[in-house]
Amino acid sequence: CNSYRVVDLGVMVSCDRILEAAERERADLIGLSGLITPSLDEMTFVAREMERRHLRTPLLIGGATTSRVHTAVKIAPGYSGVTVYVPDASRAVGVASNLLSDSLKTDYVAEIAADYEKVRVQHASKKGPSLISLEAARASAFAADWKHYAPTRPSLIGRREFRNADLAER
């Protein structure tokens, strides 16, 4: 694929199988793709396991459930190697080229690290919803006046049949 050899391990592959294959194949990069929400936690686990095993292979994160914020806040902090969010499969070749280039890698990795740090700071500074006390909520509760409410009468009560309606026309 674009002069890169890709080893596709399939779907729902365990962390051990991924890392064993990466070591056996002497992978230059490890790519994870998450299509369902539980994949997010598994990606974080893989990054922490790579750290525990002292691996330094760049980790590429992609897939429908992933995001730059999740990668920067949850995945990258668990791995001291390079972790890069790849928003679209079409960008994987460019990311791989940057990470495998002796002349581009250092600046590219520094740029990613600076961006992720900024994302983490912004994420940490976000305030949660401001909450009010139960007493204040009860004091400002909606007071319905059902005695003086007159519901609007629907224009049709019952059922309406549409005969000779061709559903293929729509």
Regions found by a protein language model. Name each.
Residues 1-7:
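Short helix-loop-beta junction
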Residues 8-77:
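Cofactor-cradling patches in redox/metallo enzymes
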Residues 4, 57, 81-82:
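A structural micro-motif
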Residues 90-170:
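Active-site loops and adjacent core secondary-structure elements that bind or stabilize anionic groups
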Residues 65, 70-105:
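Metal-dependent DNA phosphodiester-chemistry modules and their immediately adjacent helices/loops
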Residues 35, 85, 168-169:
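Generic alpha-helical structural element
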